[in-house]
Amino acid sequence: MLERTLRVLEYNKVKEQLLEHTASSLGRDKVKHLVPSTDFEEIVEMQDTTDEAAKVIRLKGSAPLGGITDIRSNVKRAKIGSMLSPNELLDIANTMYGSRNMKRFIEDMVDNGVELPILETHVAQIVSLYDLEKKITNCIGDGGEVVDSASDKLRGIRTQIRTAESRIREKLENMTRSSNAQKMLSDSIVTIRNERYVIPVKQEYRGVYGGIVHDQSASGQTLFIEPQVIVELNNALQEARVKEKQEIERILLMLTEEVAVEADIVLSNVEVVANLDFIFAKAFYAKRIKATKPIVNNERYMDLRQARHPLIDPEIIVPNNIMLGKDFTTIVITGPNTGGKTVTLKTVGICVLMAQSGLHIPVMDESEICVFKNIFADIGDEQSIEQSLSTFSSHMVNIVDILEKADFESLVLFDELGAGTDPQEGAALAISILDEVCNRGARVVATTHYPELKAYGYNREQVINASVEFDVNTLSPTYKLLIGVPGRSNAFEISKRLGLSDRVIDQARNHISTDTNKIENMIAKLEESQKNAERDWNEAEALRKQSEKLHRELQRQIIEFNDERDEKLLKAQKEGEEKVEAAKKEAEGIIQELRQLRKAQLVNVKDHELIEAKSRLEGTAPELVKKQKVNVKNTAPKQQLRAGDEVKVLTFGQKGQLLEKVSDTEWSVQIGILKMKVKESNMEYINTPKQTEKKAVASVKGRDYHVSLELDLRGERYEDAMMRVEKYLDDAQLASYPRVSIIHGKGTGALRQGVQDYLKKHRGVKNYRYGDMGEGGLGVTVVELK
């Protein structure tokens, strides 16, 4: 990618904003070396990786990247035998903790069902060095000091030091509090000079205390003397401090050697967390600019929906739909210089550069972008003073370079093509240059104010005109891109609004040919028509989204209602079975009691006693069944029953569907989610009218709700989606649908492939195919049922 292209499209400014979201110098280093890729597979993977990080941010709000620092140079020094300082070792421990914490964070999310395959692969490379981490933190405190507990020897030495210091202070403080001290001392304090305890003695009393003079005041009137009585104590203290220093060095060398042993693992972990910092910086930046993941294709076309420039405040910028590469390969944006054409040009360029860098781009969902091997841009006034080149010459130098390198894998951006010279010659050159790059198969967006290029857009098959809308009432551009409508100068309208007389304007119109006036009027009508069409489309789109939302809500309520009903039915059946079981047990108890009475001949069971026992037995029948008891006399179905018929199960008052006959008098019946055996005498045949193909929805046999002709799986997890497909196909078959549609979206294709793999194995599927253009294309699978 040309450095000049990155500069004029302000790629580095995007990187500067991205830098603000890194958590460490490791991530910042990755951002500084970021350049757009030209490898399709790599770009797709980078986009998927950024998308996973964005998912983590949506679910968790942030990622635990704190405490990570660039420790690579310290680890390399440890490998060659240098002793690391306490702070350097502490940085290594903190980074090891940070990498371990990040690994646990991602793995916990995965364990909780969040799909993060790429991030999971990244953190799987992190090797926990918990033992080394704890050794360092056990020896070095948060402030970077080696703690007493680092070794028993160090603890003992420091105990000696504290004892010696206490004895010295005690002796010196007694001296400063003596009656003679007031006249002999400059101040009643104990201080330190050259790491030895001293007191401030006046010059004239230097011989009173004996000992060693370590320092004097600026005036020379005060001497800092170590009295003779504490010289030996100070010597002992210094010896203890030397031992302390030696023990600290031994501990630091020991820890450094431990780091050296694990150096390769530590460096590998650092590289992983550097990548994670970089990845999450891209995700945080996407959130900041309200960007989305584009669909990356290798078919050389782009479809940017509501595209915005990332460096312009999203509250003031006007988003635009920009398509290139399908119906046309070149867009020529015409109109006055004040219309924001250059912003549109730069928006296309920077979106492509960002996408090829793995960054999400400021567009709406489902936007598509392709991969270009080269991006060329001739934008702005970059005349060279050193080379004494004019504006025109400077542009032409760039254009010559572009024409030498552009091919069918290139995106070429021209700003004010042909400007800076005679208008007629400039327009002619612009047309020839556009022809040249178009013939090479490049994708081109060019801006110009030459009216001759309006005709060029109509005369070339792969070229389309466009313009940036201008509001003559406010005398300012709206920055709305109108594809298919060439630009107008609006000079007469602007002049009139600014107060120029009608007489002068009319005279000016007379100097313009009739054909030109007709063209301008035609363009004005095209602008108005397009604005009206776009307004109508936006209103229709809003209504469609509202309808879809209502439809989803109704479907949710229906599903909840039926799930609740089925749950209650299942609960009622379970309670009924429990009551029947209890009745059987009580009946067995009654019978056993009668047998024992007879066997023991304790009681002569008479008729009235048997009647009473029978009454008790009947009284144990389930209350549910008794309440729902129906007179089945004459209710046995008169019509010959067949599998698939719809019946009413009288015991439960529910509709069901006959599955198969299991005996002469019993059928297997599907009631909602339940399958049970039911006697023919407990059924009532239902004569259901045939469904017509014109109806949008149909009743599912045996159920009290409707099934849609479409199943929308977009946004579903894979496992949940497959369960919904299975249930939906069963319901659709029960409803006798000949054909249904499953909406899975385009996306990465994983869900689409999963649906079609399932359809291959389903016994009820006769055939399936992708949707036609009017049915949703590759985002929909149309299923034909048996």
Swiss-Prot record:
One matching Pfam family: MSSS
Domain Smr: 711-786
SUPFAM superfamilies: DNA repair protein MutS, domain III (SSF48334), P-loop containing nucleoside triphosphate hydrolases (SSF52540), SMR domain-like (SSF160443)
Residues given in the record as ATP binding sites: G335, P336, N337, T338, G339, G340, K341, T342
Keyword S-adenosyl-L-methionine part of the UniProt annotation: no
GO molecular function: ATP binding; ATP hydrolysis activity; ATP-dependent DNA damage sensor activity; endonuclease activity; mismatched DNA binding; ribosomal large subunit binding; rRNA binding
GO biological process: mismatch repair; negative regulation of DNA recombination; rescue of stalled ribosome
InterPro entries documented for this protein: DNA_mismatch_repair_MutS_C, DNA_mismatch_repair_MutS_core, DNA_mismatch_repair_MutS_sf, MSSS, MutS, MutS2, P-loop_NTPase, Smr_dom
Assigned EC number: 3.1.-.-, 3.6.4.-
Keywords: ATP-binding, DNA-binding, Endonuclease, Hydrolase, Nuclease, Nucleotide-binding, RNA-binding, rRNA-binding
Functional description taken from the UniProt entry: Endonuclease that is involved in the suppression of homologous recombination and thus may have a key role in the control of bacterial genetic diversity.
Family: Belongs to the DNA mismatch repair MutS family. MutS2 subfamily.
Subunit structure and binding partners: Homodimer. Binds to stalled ribosomes, contacting rRNA.
PANTHER family to which the protein is assigned, alphabetical: OS10G0509000 PROTEIN (PTHR48466:SF2), OS10G0509000 PROTEIN-RELATED (PTHR48466)
Protein name: Endonuclease MutS2
Species annotation: Bacillus cereus (strain G9842)
Taxonomic lineage of the native organism: Bacteria, Bacillati, Bacillota, Bacilli, Bacillales
Gene name as annotated: mutS2
